[in-house]
Every structure is written in C-alpha cells, then in structure tokens.
Amino acid sequence: MSLSIKELYYTKDKSINNVNLADGNYVVNRGDGWILSRQNQNLGGNISNNGCTAIVGDLRIRETATPYYYPTASFNEEYIKNNVQNVFANFTEASEIPIGFEFSKTAPSNKSLYMYLQYTYIRYEIIKVLQNTVTERAVLYVPSLGYVKSIEFNSEEQIDKNFYFTSQDKCILNEKFIYKKIDDTITVKESKNSNNNINFNTSQTILPYPNGLYVINKGDGYMRTNDKDLIGTLLIESSTSGSIIQPRLRNTTRPLFNTSNPTIFSQEYTEARLNDAFNIQLFNTSTTLFKFVEEAPTNKNISMKVYNTYEKYELINYQNGNIDDKAEYYLPSLGKCEVSDAPSPQAPVVETPVDQDGFIQTGPNENIIVGVINPSENIEEISTPIPDDYTYNIPTSIQNNACYVLFKVNTTGVYKITTKNNLPPLIIYEAIGSSNRNMNSNNLSNDNIKAIKYITGLNRSDAKSYLIVSLFKDKNYYIRIPQISSSTTSQLIFKRELGNISDLADSTVNILDNLNTSGTHYYTRQSPDVGNYISYQLTIPGDFNNIASSIFSFRTRNNQGIGTLYRLTESINGYNLITINNYSDLLNNVEPISLLNGATYIFRVKVTELNNYNIIFDAYRNS
C-alpha cells in the first residue's frame, strides 16, 4: 500500500527561495541526513545502565523504504519521480535491496544511557524559477539510513526529547543544492533496464594483439557520478560506533550495460562472452554480504557514506588497430565506505550544477585482457596428442571460413608450425585454464574453454610466415587458420626443433622474398607487445660461393627495438642460428653490413616501444 502523501507544498517553510538561476524548471538534490516532521519516523529508544553497551539498529526492506512525495499543482508525483530518477538515482530499484544499520555505545560508569533511533532521508526538489526566485517547489524524500541521538542521564532525571519532535524538516548534515535544468522538450520516462547505446573514440590505446574479440577487466570500485549509487549516510556522534551492512540477495542487483551496436553486441551476447573469458558469476547467481564499521573519536562527530560499486568489463571487436564495436558491462560488486568529519548543519549551501553523467573509479585500476573465440567460427580438434613430426590435413568442409584447431603435444618442447608454402599465416593461442585440469588416457580433454591467450601470429593473409613456439604437453592450444579457398589443399605441419632455432620462441618468422632489387624494402607487420619478439627471414639474392656478398642495413620505423642478426644453417639436429651482429638501437638505424649471397639470415627484433599498431621493418640493399 502506498504511503505517499499528496498535498500542496508551496514555499511556506524556511527554504532557499532566492537563487542565481535562469528561468525554468530544475531538479535539485538537497542532500542526505534529513529528519522529517509530522511523520512516524521515530523507531524507538533503548536504555542501558551504567557501564553497559547498547546496540540499536534497523533493517530497511522494501516494505519500509517508502518515499514521500509532496507534489504541487504543476509538478505531479510522476513528474517528480521521473526527473529525479533520470538525473540522480533509481530509488525504485534501490528499494529492492535490503540494507541494515546499527549504532553502539557504552554508558559511562556513573550514568545511564538513552539512545533514540530515527530514519533519515535524501531530499530532492523540483523547483520553478522566475526572475531568480523560486515560485513553486515540489519535494521528494527518499529513504536513506538512520540517526541515533544519545543522551546520558541520572536516575529519575527528565530527558529533553524536543530534538525528536521538530516542527519542520531539518538536515542534520550539511545541506546541498545540486541542480540540473529540466528540458521540457524531452519526455522523461523511468527506464526499466540499463541498456544504453554509446559512442566511443577508436583512437584508444593500441593493443598488440591480432584481430578478434577481447574481454577486458577494467577493475573494481566503479561508481556513477551524482551519487547515483549512494546507499546512505550515517552521522555518528562522538564515542559511538556505527555500522552499515548489506546482504546482497539473489536478483536484487542489476548490471549496467552500454553498447555501441545493440544488434551485434547485445546484453545477452556480451554476458556469454564474459562468461567465456572469466567464467564470472553474473548478477542473478550469487548471494553476498558486506559490512562497514566505524567508531567516532571522543572529541568529534563523523559521517560515514556507503556506496554500491561495480566491476567493469569491456567487450571489444578489435580490427587492424581499431575498435569496431564495444560494449561496457558494469557487474554489481560490493561497496565502498567514505569516512570524514561530520559537516556542520550551519555551513553555507552552495549552488552546484550536476556532474556529467558517467563513472568514477575508486578501486584498483586493472587492464586484464582475455581473448575469446568468436562463436561464429568453427572449432576442429586433433584428439590425439601430436608427435614430434606431424601433418594435419585441414578439412575442405571448413576452408571457406576461418576456424580454430584445438590440440596438445605429446612432448614438451619448441615447435616450428607452418602451412604448406607458408601460406596462409597462422595465429596460435593457449587455452586459458587448460593446464593440469584432467587426464583422459593422454588424449585431448576438451573442457570447452573459449578463453584464449595470444602467443604469436599474424592477421594478414598475404604474409608468408611460420611460428616458433614453446609448447607444453599438459596444456591445450588453439591455432587459428584464416579463411582459405576450398580449391586450396592446406596442411598444418608440426616439427619439434632440437637446434638452437628454439632461441626464437615465441615469435612469428616473416619470410621476405623480394630482395632482388636494390633500394628500400618495407615490411609492415602487426607489432607484438613491448618485450616480445618478431623475426624476419631473408635469403640474399645470388648464388652462394661463400665469397660474393651484398650490403644491407636494417632498421625499424615508428617503433624502437633491439635487434639480433643470425645466419641460419641446417644440421642433423635441425636448424641452428649463428649470431652475426647485435643492434642496440634499431630506430632509423643506418649501420651497413655485408651479407653472403645465397645465404639465409634471420633478423630478430625485440620491441621496446609500442607507438603504432604495426612495426615497419626496413631492409635496405645498397647498389
């Protein structure tokens, strides 16, 4: 049953009536800590004898979290509710979440203690301003928490309880006046969900990863601006302890969701990808609890504000250095407590415009990036662990679409993985969480893990390359094969390397095959992350006679790097590397070096600066 009070409430009280605002209607937050007159807000008192500790408190539930409306002729209850919830807080949703609070205090050794408990409220107003004067005001009180007044007394002493029975509403904390002008051309409606479309800037931090879907954990402790997530404020008097406790029950909290493309990145699709990446417990599956306890010192009062918080996740579609689509998912977390000296109720009230809608992060900053397999792409399995030398024929039935091949190796070691004619290029990932989970007669145990960690590989379909990677027999791996023509017979070729070419792990080796002319040759490839490697294999044009040579120089552009030039040789144990030269500064390097015609070299680059999505490698051949 609604307990809303509908009565005209004009400017009869001692309210702020002169404002420095333009003509129009405004929604205003007047602050927390309001005690109401003429309402049954007194919850009762508690008496403790000398030396005893008393505890008083209350559990605010939906049935007791009743807002009080004071509409006017122009501003009815619906108008008040919609505008307040649009700007400041969804108090209808907040009332679904139970919240408890309590106070405790010990009586002195020579006196008894009387503690009297009251509800407190957050006050909102809708005002009409004309010529800097408030000509009409509607008021809404939304339940906050409570306040306890402690009085020490001697036996048979009369207690002055006038404090509790006030003739007008009053704020025991500092009043506020946070305002926003109401645009009457916009019809404000209460949102029944938190889905919003967002625009975003694609010029964000470059990710050193291939194209695909990524889920990013951006950390915990997010709160909405304008105190939209405020649970309530306790005024705790000196020598008193106060606490706020919230049991977070199933289905009483809802995520906040924004998307740039509701057709592709819907909330349901985003939640499925978050579950793929982090196996998170979504909002309707968990029951949690948090509690904050604070004690005021003997010489001053304090206030304790408690907020609901969120953990932020992002789902992005990353393509060629840009974010094509993005969704933001704010998962209800627990809470945050802010403690400060109690403000003076006599402090001046300052007119303050609302902050821009958004989020602030108060918790630890995170940027944990996990790739997820696009559900539109096929997954094939090599069910038996691959031996040291193995060839896998890619089924023709899947060659018209990109696909993943799930596998594990029989022996831990460094492997060269390539395709027939070194095309198309490959990308290899580790299946996150696949290590030491289970054993199935040494066969592949598919735990249906869709979370992947990028190791190395390239996006470009025209980039001849192969992979040198360290693989462990207790882990599962995915190789992504880009779309290839069904008329092309393609194979995955695995070989465990015993030579020191293993020094190149974990990197992609790009094959350069157009060095027949003199001049500058650019090779733009996706840049790995800082501290990781990318390699280039080149065979010097001409016949090998161990005498004739050509002059080259090697450099990077945009990205700083450290380089090592190797001569590649082959022996009975496999491929070996002979170090020819080391480069400590590759950015715009012009140092020449003489290389044997007909010989094969590998130039390995360690990225030390990520300035561009691509690394530009320049092999310059002198005439």
From Swiss-Prot:
Keyword Zinc applies: no
Region annotation HA-55 domain 3: where it falls in the sequence: 497-623
Residue span of region HA-22-23 domain 1: 7-184
UniProt keyword annotations, A-Z: Hemagglutinin, Secreted, Virulence
Matches recorded under InterPro entries: Clenterotox, HA70_C
Subcellular location: Secreted
Chain spans, region HA-55 domain 2: 373-496
Sugar binding: annotated segments: 460-462, 513-514, 522-525
Matching Pfam families: Clenterotox, HA70_C
Source organism, top-level taxon: Viruses
A Gene Ontology biological process term: symbiont-mediated migration across host transepithelium
Location of region: HA-55 domain 1: 204-372
Effect noted on mutating R604A: About 80% mucin binding
Propeptide boundaries: 1-6
Annotated GO CC locations: extracellular region
Subunit architecture: Botulinum toxins are produced as progenitor toxins of large molecular sizes of 12S (M toxin) and 16S (L toxin). M toxin consists of a non-toxic, non-hemagglutinin component (NTNHA) and the neurotoxin. L toxin consists of the M toxin and the 3 subcomponents of hemagglutinin (HA). HA is composed of subcomponents of 70, 33, and 17 kDa. The 70 kDa subcomponent undergoes proteolytic processing and is split into HA-53 (also called HA3b) and HA-22-23 (collectively called HA3a). Upon crystallization this cleaved component forms a three-lobed trimer of dimers with a hole in the center.
Note: This protein can also be encoded on a prophage.
Domain remark text: The HA-22-23 chain and the N-terminus of the HA-55 chain are structurally similar, as are the domain 2 and domain 3 of HA-55.
Protein purpose: The hemagglutinin (HA) component of the progenitor toxin protects the structural integrity of botulinum neurotoxin; may increase internalization of the neurotoxin into the bloodstream of the host. The HA component is involved in binding to the upper small intestine through interactions with glycolipids and glycoproteins containing sialic acid moieties. Whole protein and the HA-53 chain (but not the HA-22-23 chain) bind to bovine mucin; if the mucin is pretreated with neuraminidase (removes the terminal sialic acid of glycoconjugates) mucin binding is decreased.
Protein name, per record: Hemagglutinin components HA-70 type C
Gene that produces this protein: HA-70
